[in-house]
Amino acid sequence: MIEPKILKKGAGRVWVLGDLHFGVRANSMEWLDIQKQFFEEVFLPTLKKNVKPGDVLVQVGDTFDNRQSINIRVLNYAVKLFEELGKILPVHVICGNHDIWAKNSNEVTSIDSLKWIPNVQIYKEPELLNWSGKKVLMMPWRRDADHETETLSEYPTAEIVFCHSEVKGIYLNAKVKNQHGTDSNIYEKYARVFSG
């Protein structure tokens, strides 16, 4: 059995972000401006006003959009944003399928550019954490449903899962139900599952 890494006692709330896709639409500067506006006018002020001791932020994958390249302006903004977030609260970044260079490997990723930032932890491989007595699995993108099921079976004591997964049967929006991916029933045993 894998023992969890114990984090600071008295954990507070979890702020969840997902699928930021920095560099979307071929590194569009227009889209970057929209993202900047959201973070600078809405998210960061809200976070600064409401964050409490013990709170953490989890970015559940696809921080970046393009597997092959990132515009330098896009990368610089993302790094500055995560530096700012790390000054406010601990940040956990899970690797998503758009963050990896090779389809079946998490070895080379765009989120590696964030690993040097203080108070920012990246997850390229699964890791079990203990947050205030709760066993929390941080599970990055797995190459297919079988690999995902296998990974979950390696962490039988996990109670909460933060992951980047394609889950069959969930609603992608109010009208569109995902028709492919890992069957949602493998997540039924967990108290909470947060996926990008």
Q: In which residue ranges do the predicted regions lie?
A:
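A short, compositionally biased domain-edge/stem linker segment
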Residues: 1-7
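Long, contiguous hydrophobic alpha-helical segments, chiefly transmembrane helices and signal peptides
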Residues: 20, 63-64, 74, 139-141, ...
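Structural motif
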Residues: 14-16, 58, 138, 160-164, ...
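Core catalytic region of metal-dependent phosphoesterases/phosphodiesterases
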Residues: 8-13, 20, 24-128, 187-191
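Detector for methionine-enriched segments
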Residues: 1, 29, 138-139
